[in-house]
């Protein structure tokens, strides 16, 4: 059986993932935690084969940073990064960390357990791009990376033209 560590701060999402693992004949839940900072410790304490890691976890811990550290000392552990945020930069950041897959919780057309199976069979599983969402009257696919940067700055309350543009 494949030992799975779930790192997810949302109790509802964690329960749903645990339920899928329990129904599987291939996977068993090793542990389920809400903070990425504890993922390293959990991996050192036992035999973890697969980690399902949220991008942002409890106490604002970065799943990407934790994944990169884990991959440094144990590259054999497979890691799938998950998020419900349709942010396009997460895919590239996940690849840069050496993770094996990426899954959009709310937008993915591929079921989580299918992504797990493919990753455990040696495949790297990534969506081609972030899902398109509506921003006002526009579709997110219509914006450039620079335009998204400007929108983020404005959304954070920055009004100084020099700091935004």
Each PLM stretch: what is its role?
Residues 8:
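Conserved acidic carboxylate
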Residues 11-31:
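Two-component/phosphorelay signaling modules centered on CheY-like receiver
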Residues 32-50, 58:
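Acidic, metal-coordinating helix/loop segments flanking the phosphotransfer/catalytic sites
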Residues 54-56, 83:
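Active-site residues of response regulator receiver
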Residues 64-76:
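Short amphipathic alpha-helix used as the core "switch/output" element in two-component signaling
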Residues 89, 107-116:
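C-terminal output helix
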Residues 134-165:
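Helix-turn-helix DNA-binding segment
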């Amino acid at each position: 059986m494949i030992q799975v560590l779930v790192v997810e701060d949302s109790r509802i999402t964690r329960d749903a993932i645990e339920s899928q693992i329990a129904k599987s004949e291939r996977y068993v839940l090793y542990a389920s935690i809400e903070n990425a900072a504890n993922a390293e410790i959990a991996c050192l304490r036992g035999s973890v084969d697969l980690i399902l890691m949220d991008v942002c976890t409890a106490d604002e811990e970065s799943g990407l940073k934790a994944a990169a550290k884990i991959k440094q000392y144990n590259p054999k552990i497979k890691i799938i990064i998950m998020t419900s945020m349709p942010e396009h930069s997460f895919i590239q950041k996940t690849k840069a960390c050496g993770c094996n897959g990426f899954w959009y919780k709310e937008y993915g057309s591929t079921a989580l357990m299918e992504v797990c199976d493919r990753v455990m069979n040696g495949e790297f599983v990534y969506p081609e791009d972030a899902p398109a969402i509506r921003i006002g009257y526009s579709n997110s696919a219509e914006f450039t990376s620079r335009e998204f940067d400007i929108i983020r700055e404005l959304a954070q309350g920055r009004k100084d033209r020099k700091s935004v543009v």
